[in-house]
């Protein structure tokens, strides 16, 4: 019991002496730097993905890619249209709606403002479309001070044929394989009787208006045009020249015939024969119903 109490009483003094000696030794061997402080770094690891990507994300990515491709295509188209516009060329190559009409009208007005003394070439390859949009283009063609030369290629049908005939007389042409079609405006009505009556009056107004415009473009009578547009009437370029809707056919580097435009010409004849002797094909004794 005495030994145990002696050792336990000596142990604290022994430990403190060892600590004092070690601290003094370390302080004497390694000088303590002043103001030494290490800033702890905080490691941030990305969260682990526990689920697969949503299909909606891939759908959005594909939509963005398609929109980018469409924007690139539209940009290329606008570049082409811009180059054509520098050459005073306007191209109508689609169905006619309000958006297309706004583009065509703005280009015509721009070119007319830049130089009203130079011709504007309006190329047409269109199946027609909205009558109101077509009337807007027609009015602008008549409004501009510059001569508008219309050139049909492919097809100029329905309301597009009105724009074709609206060009400056003597400067309305078509390519050899173009098809041209005129007809009366389409329309329909439903609902109450009074609504049907109102729509019917509007359709008749549009029909009379279109008939008057075609008669003015072709120098034909109102009654004759009214009869001709009762059904779809397709024409070749030569037949369109005969009808008075255009003034010549572009065949290579030549335009035939341009002057004079015969009033009565047999249809479906060789272009070269007409250019050599157009008077030979004049047949005033044949009535219109047999010619067309």
UniProtKB/Swiss-Prot annotation:
Its main location: plastid. The keyword Acetylation applies. It is found in: Plastid, Chloroplast stroma. Induction: Repressed in darkness. Levels decrease in leaves during aging (at protein level). Slightly and transiently repressed by high light stress (at protein level). Residues 1-65 form a transit peptide. InterPro entries: ClpP, ClpP/crotonase-like_dom_sf, ClpP/TepA, ClpP_His_AS. Transmembrane segments: none annotated. The active site is at residues 158, 183. Cleaves peptides in various proteins in a process that requires ATP hydrolysis. Has a chymotrypsin-like activity. Plays a major role in the degradation of misfolded proteins. Essential protein required for chloroplast development and integrity. Essential for Embryogenesis. This is ATP-dependent Clp protease proteolytic subunit 4, chloroplastic. The lineage of its organism: Eukaryota, Viridiplantae, Streptophyta, Embryophyta, Tracheophyta.
């Amino acid at each position: 019991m005495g030994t145990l109490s002696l050792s336990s009483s000596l142990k604290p003094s022994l430990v403190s002496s060892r600590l004092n000696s070690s601290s003094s030794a370390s302080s004497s061997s390694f000088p303590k730097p002043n103001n030494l402080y290490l800033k702890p770094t905080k490691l941030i690891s990305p969260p682990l993905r526990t689920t697969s990507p949503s299909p909606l994300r891939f759908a959005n990515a594909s939509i963005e890619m398609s929109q980018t491709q469409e924007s690139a295509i539209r940009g290329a188209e606008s570049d082409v249209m811009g180059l054509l516009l520098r050459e005073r060329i306007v191209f109508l190559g689609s169905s006619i709606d309000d958006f297309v009409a706004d583009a065509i009208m703005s280009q015509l007005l721009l070119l007319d403002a830049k130089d009203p003394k130079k011709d504007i070439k309006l190329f047409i390859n269109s199946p027609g479309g909205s009558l109101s949009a077509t009337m807007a283009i027609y009015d602008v063609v008549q409004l501009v001070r510059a001569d508008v030369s219309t050139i049909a290629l492919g097809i100029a049908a329905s309301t597009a044929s009105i724009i074709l005939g609206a060009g400056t007389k003597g400067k309305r042409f078509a390519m050899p394989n173009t098809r041209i079609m005129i007809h009366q405006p389409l329309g329909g009505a439903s609902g109450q009787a009074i609504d049907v009556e109102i729509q019917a009056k509007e359709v008749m107004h549009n029909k009379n208006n279109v008939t008057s415009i075609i008669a003015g473009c072709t120098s034909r009578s109102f009654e004759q045009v009214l009869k001709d547009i009762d059904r779809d009437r397709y024409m070749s370029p030569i037949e369109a020249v005969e009808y008075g809707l255009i003034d010549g056919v572009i065949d290579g580097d030549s335009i035939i015939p341009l002057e004079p435009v015969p009033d009565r010409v047999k249809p479906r004849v060789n272009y070269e024969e007409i250019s050599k002797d157009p008077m030979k094909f004049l047949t005033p004794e044949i009535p219109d119903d047999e010619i067309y």
